[in-house]
């Protein structure tokens, strides 16, 4: 690792490694969201048995497996963080697990082959999703922490903008793939093989692009076994607990957000009038409203909304998140209204769900982007990936919670209408937002950035006290 930079250079502009990391993230997110955009629909409408006969899952079963998959993707960052911070560093963790990720996508693409059907599409689906969980989950905390590692004191003023562009790249990739992959799935000429194969090609490109920037990036060395000792020390646990107290309430946001991304909202859209501006949309394409809107909202909230609110009261990161949680709850009020009309035998316009996406995406812009920056800046230097994993664990917990609710409905034979289902989650979000607002009032900020030191100086720096507290 001696040939690589191990601490941020003294720059006032954007670090040279950032474009490679952001480009990699755009392609990887294209892969992930493209695959996920068709996953629930594939299970509910396209999956075959070993005889090649259509054998779809029911709606709640497909919901449950989708949420369990996302739970795995966002739970496994814990292992990726330990591997990166403690043993092989962020770069090698990302590169090695990206290969596993590619193999998982290849497995899903092969489900449509004759031998894939003979083995069993459910078995192939399980193997592929487990590999994607390992790959996508393992690299998740490392990528966002790695991009933050490129910055030091001299260019820390660009960190907030960088996380905005980082999130922009996520949604640019998501937007394109969420249009393409449902189209491939719905077109008999292409079908599931291409719908899952295109994301696999994108992941291969992401891996090669990241490898191509290896000499431009800062490679912060792992802390070794001392990382585990310090992380699980009393002080390390208190650090994680202090941040986790804030993160706990955000899991409810991610649980609700996950419903809009190829799951419950998509199946609701199938029961709506999908004619929009002269186009006949596919239900799975409606979710592309989210990445389109996030690309619009990122500059609006950063350059218009936040400065305007700041004139009324100081807009701290946790206040941004709190406002975003209340906005998210309001988006589900619209979903409840839509479901009421559907249950009454009507076929409401998809414009109503697009309104819900607009409100939800505004909430996301305030919660998710702010949360990424908060997770990075509030974590000690040797624990960047670990705290990012804790942030991602809120996504896993949210998805896991929703999966458990669906499991309870399935296993208990409960007769819960979709209207009652969405109403429950609406009130849950309101309650979480209220309690979060109270808890956030007691949080004390402490910011840490990577020191612009030599490799030897970094090696002698105390593990839990790196960076510049502010």
Description of each model-found segment:
Residues 136-154, 364-379:
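Intracellular juxtamembrane helix-capping segments at the cytosolic ends
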Residues 64-85, 172-175, 288-303, 397-400:
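Central cavity-lining transmembrane alpha-helices of secondary-active solute carriers
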Residues 280, 294, 303-451:
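C-terminal transmembrane bundle
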Residues 37-61, 149, 262-283:
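Short amphipathic helix-loop junctions that connect adjacent transmembrane helices
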Residues 37, 75-82, 109-110, 171-187, ...:
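A gly/Pro-rich, aromatic-decorated transmembrane alpha-helix motif that marks the paired
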Residues 1-23, 151-160, 164, 169, ...:
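Intracellular loop-helix junctions on the cytosolic face of multi-pass helical membrane proteins
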Residues 97-120, 326-345:
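C-terminal ends and interior cores of transmembrane alpha-helices
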Residues 26, 102-104, 118-139, 338, ...:
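Hydrophobic core of transmembrane alpha-helices in multi-pass small-molecule transporters
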């Amino acid at each position: 690792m001696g040939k690589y930079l191990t601490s941020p250079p003294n720059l006032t502009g954007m670090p040279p490694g950032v474009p490679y990391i952001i480009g990699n993230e755009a392609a990887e997110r294209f892969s992930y969201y493209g695959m996920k955009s068709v996953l629930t629909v594939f299970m509910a409408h396209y999956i075959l048995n070993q005889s090649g006969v259509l054998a779809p899952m029911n709606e709640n079963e497909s919901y449950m497996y989708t949420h369990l998959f996302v739970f795995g993707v966002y739970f496994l960052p814990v292992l990726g963080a330990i591997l990166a911070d403690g043993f092989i560093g962020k770069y090698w963790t990302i590169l090695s697990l990206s290969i596993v990720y590619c193999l998982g996508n290849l497995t899903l693409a092969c489900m449509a082959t004759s031998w894939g059907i003979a083995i069993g599409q459910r078995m192939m689906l399980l193997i592929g999703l487990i590999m994607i969980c390992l790959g996508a989950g393992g690299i998740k905390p490392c990528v966002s922490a790695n991009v933050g590692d490129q910055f030091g004191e001299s260019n820390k003023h660009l960190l907030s903008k960088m996380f905005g562009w980082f999130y922009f790249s996520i949604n640019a990739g998501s937007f394109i793939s969420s249009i393409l992959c449902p189209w491939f799935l719905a077109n008999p000429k292409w079908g599931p093989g291409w719908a899952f194969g295109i994301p696999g090609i994108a992941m291969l490109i992401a891996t090669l692009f990241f490898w191509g920037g290896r000499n431009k990036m800062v490679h912060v060395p792992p802390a070794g076994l001392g990382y585990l000792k310090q992380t699980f020390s009393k002080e390390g646990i208190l650090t994680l607990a202090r941040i986790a107290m804030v993160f706990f309430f955000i899991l409810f946001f991610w649980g609700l957000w996950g419903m809009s991304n190829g799951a419950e909202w998509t199946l609701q859209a199938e029961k709506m009038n999908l004619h929009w501006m002269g186009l006949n949309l596919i239900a799975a394409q409606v979710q592309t409203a989210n990445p389109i809107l996030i690309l619009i909202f990122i500059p609006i909230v950063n350059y218009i909304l936040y400065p305007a609110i700041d004139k009324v009261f100081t807009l701290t990161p946790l206040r941004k998140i709190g406002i975003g949680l209340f906005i998210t709850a309001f988006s589900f009020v619209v979903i409840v209204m839509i479901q009421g009309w559907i249950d009454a035998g009507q076929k409401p316009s998809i414009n109503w769900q697009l309104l819900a996406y607009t409100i939800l995406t505004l909430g996301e812009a305030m919660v998710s982007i702010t949360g990424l920056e908060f997770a990075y800046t509030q974590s000690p230097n040797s624990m960047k990936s670990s705290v990012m994993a804790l942030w991602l664990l809120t996504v896993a917990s949210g998805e896991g919670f929703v999966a458990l609710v669906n499991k309870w409905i399935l296993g208990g034979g409960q007769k819960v209408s979709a209207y009652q289902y969405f109403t429950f989650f609406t009130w849950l979000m309101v309650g979480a937002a209220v309690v979060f607002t109270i808890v956030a009032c007691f949080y004390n900020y402490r910011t840490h950035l990577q020191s612009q030191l030599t490799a030897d100086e970094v090696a002698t720096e105390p593990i839990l006290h790196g960076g510049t507290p502010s």
